[in-house]
Amino acid sequence: MIYKVLYQKDKIVNPRRETTQTLYMEADNMVEARSTVEDNTPYNIELIQELTGNSLAYEKEHADFKLTKFDKK
């Protein structure tokens, strides 16, 4: 499954909508997606959303869609 992860670059600064960034990743479930991002980055995760059907098609067409791959630990 493909997940859209909204995050802030670090956990120290208070989150602001204007600085929220996005990455797209593949994972078996939402728990795995969260743990993978937490284990490999210093990011403050705001939201993880599963993308399917029309949502996935929209993101591929209208966003800077690129799957992020993390090394397995």
From Swiss-Prot:
GO terms for molecular function: DNA binding; DNA-directed RNA polymerase activity. Keywords: DNA-directed RNA polymerase, Nucleotidyltransferase, Transcription, Transferase. Pfam families: RpoY (PF07288). It comes from the Bacteria. InterPro entries: RpoY. GO terms for cellular component: DNA-directed RNA polymerase complex. It catalyses: RNA(n) + a ribonucleoside 5'-triphosphate = RNA(n+1) + diphosphate. Its EC number is 2.7.7.6. One of its GO terms (biological process) is DNA-templated transcription. A non-essential component of RNA polymerase (RNAP). NCBIfam families: PRK13667.1. Belongs to the RNA polymerase subunit epsilon family. RNAP is composed of a core of 2 alpha, a beta and a beta' subunit. The core is associated with a delta subunit, and at least one of epsilon or omega. When a sigma factor is associated with the core the holoenzyme is formed, which can initiate transcription. This is DNA-directed RNA polymerase subunit epsilon.
